């Protein structure tokens, strides 16, 4: 049977992390599956907390491992996980999720059912859209007509339709709170300059890299609870600014033509119009700052340029 490495990338969210580990320990390791759990720490977890995790996971048949990073950042935590993990499958979970008891068993069974899969992801409970919300997202290029595809502006709003799925389906992107890959599909992961400070889009980039090794799938049976804890989040202006800027980098790295940038411009304009009635001035300011960079970005690198030559060649086409 395939072996499994679970990675929890965290920073100063002990309550969230403890709740997550509790849910993993209750479910336990899949039968016959060698399972390890890595806590990749950008903060300062107390020693007594770490010792409690080790005892708790040990009773559940899961080997506990810990690494404290020197340089913070979610993408760098992904890179470090790939360096350290020993499992055939690497499962990335946000530290503020809760797993149902059968989650890990269902995940490994899905890999057995889809041996060609480079990655398998799941769904966050409660993510859905109204009919009118779906129409607005389609018209503003925040989602595509297909639940497994990104929009023209490379937005992942299609995931709001994932809850309607009754069976496993192909996708070109994952939700970062709940995604797994064959270790070989993401081996050699490297730092990316534009993902060092803010992580929006890192799940899309990781999915794109893995997809060069094989198809990706979403299994609706892999549904978990995502609390989306607000702690350790950046201010709203920075969040909205980097949300657009990182999508610019995603367009650059896939060598998008003018249509992709035009679509992102329209999506950003829509976001500004949406926030005005709410008087969310910080969000609007962030979007306006990024709006100026969209078309100028097609010629000059922004904060680091492309991925490494190896990965940029893999993603071309």
Model-predicted segments: where are they?
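Acidic donor-binding segment of Leloir-type glycosyltransferases
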Residues: 22-68
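Non-catalytic, C-terminal membrane-associated alpha-helical segments of glycosyltransferases
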Residues: 238-246, 257-317
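Glycine-rich, basic loop-to-helix element that forms the pyrophosphate-binding segment
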Residues: 69-85
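Short aromatic/hydrophobic "clamp" motif used to bind/position activated sugar donors
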Residues: 90
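Short, flexible, basic/aromatic active-site loop/helix in glycosyltransferases
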Residues: 140-171
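N-proximal low-complexity "stem/linker" segments adjacent to membrane-targeting elements
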Residues: 1-26, 32
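Conserved donor NDP-sugar-binding/catalytic core segment of glycosyltransferases
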Residues: 102-146
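Acidic donor-binding loop at a coil-to-helix junction in glycosyltransferase catalytic cores
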Residues: 174-177, 197-206
